[in-house]
Amino acid sequence: MDDDSTESDGPTRRTYMRYCEAVVGGGLLAGCTSNSETTPSPTESETNSSTDASTNEATETEESSYTVSMEPVGTVAFESVPERWIAYDGAYADMAVALGQADGMTGIGGADRYYTAVYDELPGVSVDRETIEANPEVRTKEQFYELENDVHLYDPEMLINWFDWDRDDVDEIATNVAPFLGNLIFRRSDDWHDYRYYTLYEAFETVATVFQERERYEAFAQLHDEFVTVIQEGLPPADERPSVLLTFEGADEPEAFSPYRLDDEGTSKKQWRDLGVDDALAGTDIENLSTTNRGKLDYENLLEIDPDVLLVRGHERASAAEFRETVLAFMESHPVASELTAVQNGQVYRGGYLHQGPIQNLFLTERGAKQLYPDVFGGEESDERLFDRQRVADIVTGDR
């Protein structure tokens, strides 16, 4: 377990400001002042895709038609750029919004896990909540027929394994309404998902190809790489970083938790991997939450692991203060939970979205950096901004 002493030789907020100055010329960080025009080279490989490594290909077959490839569907032909679209989860919806396609959204597969509050911080960026609320759980053939979309950003294998579809149902909608194109990427622990996975930015690149928005994708990829580079350069040495346990439990008075392994590499854990944390489950035989594994850990189990930081998903509509006043307060008064190091040090935080797209990931990475390394990046509720909201908004709205 890492020492939590403030008398550390690791980076301080002054150290971070030097990194801030290094990229202010590129508009990455707001609120910094510097004459420096130096921009660090990205070290994050997430967005460095190539033709050989990625199936995000667009092949012109006629002047206006093109094809896009993604497992498990394979190659899909488009006669024109889709105007009406729907996504199953918030990650793919966020990708389409990032590409300037918000007006074409007709609904979503799961509105309860599509968090749109982040758009409030981006001038000119929004989604129509009435549309989402009118079609919040689009999962049946009848709904797909009714909405008449031009593309369905759904993994059809997910429909088969979670919602009792069969192959004929998928083929029927793909033939009579519009194709499916999507891959369930938020975790990598489901036995039925025996085909290729994609990183967040590989999937984003594919969606960009669907909407023929290469320039917007590349602008986001550049911003992302610069942002992650700056954050990683500000991190403490590896042996001074906290051990982190990521869990799910939506109750305000939680008694048991579903565990996540960070080495699962699903996109829902991307910010924690980028922040270089030590997975508290490493070296244990505890398995990642999946379709078949619904096991939970009680407080006695958590005490055996005793992470420096405990992250709890399921509270993303609560503010940091509301989370502390409910979940953390309950743990502090609990006879067993109160013995946890994370509880005693007040290091129990919201764990981030289950489904995150490129816009959401920027906000979640910023929040995670402030949660885990407040001496460097400012506390969770500080006014520090680690990326430029206006730059993001300009990419989305096309004003870059």
Model-based region annotation:
Residues M1-R400:
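Terminal disorder- and signal-encoded targeting elements
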